C-alpha cells in the first residue's frame, strides 16, 4: 500500500508527540513501541497539566484498561480539550462488555468527544455498539470475519468515527469504505499489551494522515513487524523484543512487499 509506506516515512520525519492516558500494565511497552517506530510518547494524566500537554501533543490516545475514580475524569477532560483543539483522538475501550463501568466510560467518551478512531477487538466493539442502542451489533463476542466487517461498518456509522475491529483479520471502516488487513501473527496474543501498542501506533499515524488511512497504516506496520519478529524469535519473551526491533527496522520497501490489504466499497 503506497499510502502506508509514505505515512511511515512522514511519521519518522515529523516525530509526532503522542499523549497516552493508558493503563499501568502497558505504559512501558507502549512507550517503547512508539519510540522504536519513530514517534515520541508521553504518558501524562495529571489533571493540572492536561491542558498544556494536550495542546502540544500531535495526537491523544485514551485507553481504559485500568480505570479508577481519578483516571476517568482525566480521560474525559483530555478528550474534551483535544476535541476543542481538533486534535486526533484514538479510543481503546479495553474490556468493554466485561463490566458496566468499562462500557459506560467508553460510551460517555464516544458521546461527547470527537473520536477519530475507535480501536478494539471484536467483543469490545460489539459491546459498546450493542449498549448504544440504535444498532445491536452482534450477539456473540466470538470472532467471525464476516460479522467483524459488518461490526466495523456499523460502529463507524453509529459513532461517526473510524472503527477498527482487530482479530485474525483486521477490519477498518469509516462507514463508506472498508479495509481488511491480514498482517500480524498469533504470537501477539501471548504477549500482554500488543493491542494497546497497536492503538498508540494508530495514534502516531493519525498525526500524519486522515483517521481511516492512519488506522490502516498502524495495523499494517505493526502486523508486518510482528510477522518479521516471529521469524527470528518464536517464543513470547524474545518475540516481544524483536517486535520492537522490527518496528525500528521496517521501511517503505518492506511495507510494499508484505502488506496484505483489501479495500471494499460499501
Curated annotation (Swiss-Prot):
The record's top EC class is transferase
One Pfam match: HK
Q: Which GO terms describe its molecular function?
A: ATP binding; hydroxyethylthiazole kinase activity; magnesium ion binding
Task: Write down the chemical reaction(s) this protein catalyses.
Answer: 5-(2-hydroxyethyl)-4-methylthiazole + ATP = 4-methyl-5-(2-phosphooxyethyl)-thiazole + ADP + H(+)
Keywords of the record, alphabetical order, are: ATP-binding, Kinase, Magnesium, Metal-binding, Nucleotide-binding, Thiamine biosynthesis, Transferase
A GO BP entry is:
thiamine biosynthetic process
Q: Which residues bind ATP?
A: 119, 166
Pathway given in the UniProt record: Cofactor biosynthesis; thiamine diphosphate biosynthesis; 4-methyl-5-(2-phosphoethyl)-thiazole from 5-(2-hydroxyethyl)-4-methylthiazole: step 1/1
Extract the signal peptide range.
Answer: none
Q: What is its EC number?
A: 2.7.1.50
Q: Where does substrate bind?
A: 43, 193
**Similarity annotation:** Belongs to the Thz kinase family.
Q: Which HAMAP family match?
A: Thz_kinase
NCBIfam families per record: PRK09355.1, thiM
Function field: Catalyzes the phosphorylation of the hydroxyl group of 4-methyl-5-beta-hydroxyethylthiazole (THZ).
User: How is this protein named in the record?
Assistant: Hydroxyethylthiazole kinase
Its lineage opens with: Archaea, Methanobacteriati, Methanobacteriota, Methanomada group, Methanococci
Amino acid at each position: 500500500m503506497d499510502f502506508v509506506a509514505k505515512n511511515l516515512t512522514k511519521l519518522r520525519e515529523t516525530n509526532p508527540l503522542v499523549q497516552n492516558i493508558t493503563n499501568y500494565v502497558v505504559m512501558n511497552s507502549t512507550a517503547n513501541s512508539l519510540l522504536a517506530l519513530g514517534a515520541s510518547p508521553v504518558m501524562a494524566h495529571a489533571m493540572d497539566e492536561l491542558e498544556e500537554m494536550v495542546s502540544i501533543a500531535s495526537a491523544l490516545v485514551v485507553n481504559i484498561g485500568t480505570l479508577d475514580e481519578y483516571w476517568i475524569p482525566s480521560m474525559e477532560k483530555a478528550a474534551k480539550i483535544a476535541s476543542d483543539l481538533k486534535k486526533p483522538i484514538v479510543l481503546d475501550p479495553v474490556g468493554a462488555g466485561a463490566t458496566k463501568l468499562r462500557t459506560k466510560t467508553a460510551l460517555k467518551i464516544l458521546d461527547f468527544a470527537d473520536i477519530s478512531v475507535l480501536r478494539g477487538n471484536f467483543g469490545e466493539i460489539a459491546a459498546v455498539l450493542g449498549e448504544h442502542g440504535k444498532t445491536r451489533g452482534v450477539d456473540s463476542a466470538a470472532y467471525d470475519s464476516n460479522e467483524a466487517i459488518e461490526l466495523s461498518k456499523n460502529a463507524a456509522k453509529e459513532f461517526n468515527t473510524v472503527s477498527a475491529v482487530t482479530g485474525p483479520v483486521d477490519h477498518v471502516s469509516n462507514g463508506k469504505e472498508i479495509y481488511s488487513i491480514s498482517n500480524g501473527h498469533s504470537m501477539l496474543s501471548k504477549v500482554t499489551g500488543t493491542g494497546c501498542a497497536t492503538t498508540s501506533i494508530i495514534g502516531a499515524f493519525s498525526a500524519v494522515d486522515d483517521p481511516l488511512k492512519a488506522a490502516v497504516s498502524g495495523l499494517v506496520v505493526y502486523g508486518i513487524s510482528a510477522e518479521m519478529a516471529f521469524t527470528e524469535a518464536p517464543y513470547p519473551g524474545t518475540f516481544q523484543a524483536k517486535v520492537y526491533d522490527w518496528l525500528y527496522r521496517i521501511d517503505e520497501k518492506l511495507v510494499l512487499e508484505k502488506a496484505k490489504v483489501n479495500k471494499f466499497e460499501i
